[in-house]
């Protein structure tokens, strides 16, 4: 496994960085060497598994006969949140099951050593300290003193802020500005409540995106593809033809919630001719994806079928079975071919599926496993779609979504495009291309997928980010993260339950250690250069590198994990380098969610630049520019791609917190002046990104938003 480290600069080389570093070292973060012997690290799902004796159904009907006609009697309605509203303020620490270790030493040390066998470490080693000694000589950037003037932000009303923007445009897009999970739902809800906003649409991506919404009665609904406006009376909701849908999962996990709640959706939800995610797409995802690299929702395989024009769309299910059979048979060649190449039997696939579900989290549904067992797989699918979709009286109405959205705008109505994932997770962004989703989830991708006339209709983008605790889930580079993106998965930590009990559970102590010891010259402007020192945090369970401690503590304290899977997201500092490009491409408006978290921080960190440092001294050529050790990448410079970003370290500006003047909705007096720390944070973000901050989130409720006067 390659060393994945962070930091960089586009043009100016800093003379203050030493090159005298041993290979495979990194400042302030755990190393990522090749897995040690006996490692738990499962690099991919590719390896063939031994043959085992499994009972495989000879008839496809055997499974179907056991099922209810249109829904299973027991349906899990809560799914993993890929883009959930981030929790706010103080969160009760998640219950974490103890980690069982074989070592006989003290409980904390034995637990830690059992996990570090993967090659990563919880503690700081000597090589990390050596690297920090080189980077600490970096001359402080003048930008660390910016902005020279802190703006004063005045609160205004929803009507004088957001509603004015809505009324000046025809198409409103709410888009993620980082790597998903930014808390877009609250902004979507605010826009959807505008009386002129009659249409809410999801126009691309699939069930790998998600959001939680609540109705007036406080009932919780977890949606993936279903638009948020379904709970608002008088709103029409659409799922466009560029979306990809597993219709069985859609009915069992999303529509069933509406049925059980007695919500009539028949005249308010319409589905276009979507591409169909089949069970073999999900199995291809399982068999071909590295650990932690996929949601196992079949996204890459189904988009491959779409591009190759081999898959099926919803209309195929509602027409003759013979055409459906032929298309399924042709498209399934990829799946059957992979089994042959990997020398896998159906029983092997079933075993892998059950292993994925062995911790109690259903990542592979029963009907997908039943497909893997079926002898006649094509006939299994034809019957599945006939019973669960075509003949299902609960399946929503279908329509030409593009036509309906166009007609609505011509009538003077407003259309809200609900963006899945985010700008940097878009497959159209080459910088993170290998670790993105498979759709273009930028604002440009949303508008293109909607097929609304961009020359005729006025559109606006509301970008959403969160702070503190910006996060990314899955693999890939993320310079401002506290640990590498594969840190948890490399140690076989699929959920927060896999962490030792009470590990870094005292968030207050962890963050205090970070800002007190991790930035030793934070109060000395002449010496503070923004490089985080590899100090350690200790508790009763052991000793931890401060980056590791913050990653664990943030995930637990802020609830940064999947709602059901508990898969931890990797948190870090707000990244102005990446945010600058987002606002330069998608427009100036930015809303920051969950800012009330800052009520519990001594200081808040903001990444204003990267320093490139490859411990092996290697240079990286990106778009014709060669990055070398000591180069600085500032906000506004071209963002390099992942081969360079893996060796980029954040340069962090620290801002004093506002503990004595909390902004959480439950504690703040309405229209009270914002604390200086909040104003300095917002001023810093605006200065380095050229954005206009429209609002900040300050609580869990839908109306816990502070709108700022422009």
Swiss-Prot record:
Cofactor(s) for this UniProt protein: Mg(2+)
Query: What detail does the entry give on cofactor binding?
Result: Binds 1 Mg(2+) ion per subunit.
Q: Where does GTP bind?
A: 180-186, 210-212, 569, 697-699
EC number(s) from the headed UniProt entry: 6.3.4.4
Binding residues for IMP: 181-184, 208-211, 295, 309, 421, 437, 567
List the Pfam families.
Adenylsucc_synt (PF00709)
Q: Pathway, according to UniProt?
A: Purine metabolism; AMP biosynthesis via de novo pathway; AMP from IMP: step 1/2
- Entry annotation: catalytic residues: 181 (proton acceptor), 211 (proton donor)
Residues involved in substrate binding: 563-569
Q: What class of enzyme is it?
A: ligase
Q: Which residues bind Mg(2+)?
A: 181, 210
Q: What keywords are annotated for this sequence in UniProt? A: Cytoplasm, GTP-binding, Ligase, Magnesium, Metal-binding, Nucleotide-binding, Purine biosynthesis
Gene Ontology terms for molecular function: adenylosuccinate synthase activity; GTP binding; magnesium ion binding
Location of the protein in the cell: Cytoplasm
Q: Which Gene3D superfamilies match?
A: Adenylosuccinate Synthetase, subunit A, domain 1, Adenylosuccinate Synthetase, subunit A, domain 2, Adenylosuccinate Synthetase, subunit A, domain 3
The biological processes this protein is annotated with in GO are: 'de novo' AMP biosynthetic process; IMP metabolic process
Q: What does this protein do?
A: Plays an important role in the salvage pathway for purine nucleotide biosynthesis. Catalyzes the first committed step in the biosynthesis of AMP from IMP.
> Which family is annotated?
Belongs to the adenylosuccinate synthetase family.
Please identify the protein, giving its name as recorded: Adenylosuccinate synthetase
Organism the protein comes from: Leishmania infantum
């Amino acid at each position: 496994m390659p060393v994945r480290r962070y930091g960089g600069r586009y043009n100016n080389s800093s003379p203050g960085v030493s090159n005298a570093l041993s290979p495979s070292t990194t400042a302030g973060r755990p190393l990522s060497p090749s897995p040690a012997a006996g490692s738990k690290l499962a690099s991919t799902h590719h390896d063939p598994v031994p043959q085992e004796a499994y009972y495989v159904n000879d008839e496809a009907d055997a499974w179907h006969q056991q099922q209810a006609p249109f829904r299973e009697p027991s349906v899990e309605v809560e799914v993993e949140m890929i883009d959930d509203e981030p929790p706010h303020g103080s969160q009760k620490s998640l219950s974490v099951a103890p980690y069982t270790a074989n070592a006989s030493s003290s409980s904390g040390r034995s637990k830690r050593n059992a996990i570090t066998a993967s090659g990563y470490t919880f503690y700081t080693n000597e090589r990390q300290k050596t690297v920090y000694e080189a980077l600490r000589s970096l001359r402080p950037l003048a930008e660390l003193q910016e902005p020279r003037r802190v703006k004063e932000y005045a609160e205004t009303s929803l009507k004088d802020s957001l509603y004015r923007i809505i009324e000046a445009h025809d198409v409103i897009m709410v888009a993620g500005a980082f790597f998903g999970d930014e808390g877009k739902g609250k902004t979507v809800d605010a826009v959807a409540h505008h009386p002129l906003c009659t249409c809410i649409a999801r126009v691309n991506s699939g069930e790998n995106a998600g959001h939680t919404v609540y109705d007036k009665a406080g009932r919780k609904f977890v949606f993936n593809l279903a638009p948020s406006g379904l709970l608002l009376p008088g709103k029409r909701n659409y799922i466009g033809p560029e979306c990809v849908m597993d219709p069985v999962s859609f009915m069992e996990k999303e529509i069933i919630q509406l049925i059980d709640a007695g919500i009539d959706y028949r005249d308010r939800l319409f589905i276009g001719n979507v591409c169909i995610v089949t069970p073999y797409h999900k199995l291809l995802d399982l068999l071909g994806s590295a650990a932690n690299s996929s949601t196992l929702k079949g996204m890459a395989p189904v988009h491959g079928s779409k591009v190759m024009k081999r898959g099926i769309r919803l209309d195929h299910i509602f027409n003759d079975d013979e055409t459906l059979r032929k298309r399924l048979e042709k498209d399934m060649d990829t799946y059957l071919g992979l089994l042959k190449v990997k020398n896998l039997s159906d029983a092997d696939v079933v075993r892998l599926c059950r292993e994925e579900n062995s911790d109690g989290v259903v990542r592979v549904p029963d009907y997908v496993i039943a497909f893997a067992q079926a002898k006649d797989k094509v006939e299994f699918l034809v019957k599945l779609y006939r019973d669960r979709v075509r003949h299902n009286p609960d399946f929503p109405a279908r329509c030409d979504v593009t036509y309906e959205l166009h007609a609505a705008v011509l009538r003077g109505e407003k259309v809200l495009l609900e963006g899945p994932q985010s700008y940097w997770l878009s497959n159209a962004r080459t910088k993170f291309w290998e670790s993105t989703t498979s759709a273009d989830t930028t604002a440009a991708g949303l508008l293109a997928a909607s097929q609304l006339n961009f020359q005729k209709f006025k559109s606006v983008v509301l970008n959403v980010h969160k702070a503190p605790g910006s996060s990314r889930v899955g693999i890939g580079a993320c310079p401002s993260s506290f640990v590498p993106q594969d840190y948890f998965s490399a140690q076989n930590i699929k959920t927060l339950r896999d962490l030792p009990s009470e590990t870094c559970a005292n968030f207050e102590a962890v963050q205090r250690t970070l800002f007190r010891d991790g930035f030793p010259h934070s109060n000395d402007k002449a010496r503070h250069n923004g490089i985080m020192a590899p100090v350690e945090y200790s508790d009763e369970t052991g000793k931890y590198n401060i980056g590791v401690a913050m990653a664990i503590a943030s995930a637990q304290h802020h609830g940064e994990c999947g709602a059901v899977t508990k898969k931890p997201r990797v948190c870090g500092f707000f990244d102005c380098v990446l945010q600058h490009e987002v606002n330069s491409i998608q427009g100036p408006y930015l809303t920051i969610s969950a800012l009330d978290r800052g009520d519990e921080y001594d200081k808040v960190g903001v990444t204003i630049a990267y320093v490139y440092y490859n411990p092996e001294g290697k240079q990286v050529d990106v778009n014709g520019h060669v990055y070398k050790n000591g180069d600085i990448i500032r906000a506004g410079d071209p963002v390099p791609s992942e081969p360079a970003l893996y060796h980029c370290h954040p340069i962090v500006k620290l801002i004093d917190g506002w503990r004595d003047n909390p902004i959480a909705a439950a504690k703040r007096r309405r229209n009270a002046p914002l604390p200086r720390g909040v104003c300095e944070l917002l001023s810093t973000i605006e200065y380095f990104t050229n954005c206009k901050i429209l609002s900040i989130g300050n609580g869990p409720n839908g109306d816990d938003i502070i709108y700022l006067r422009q």
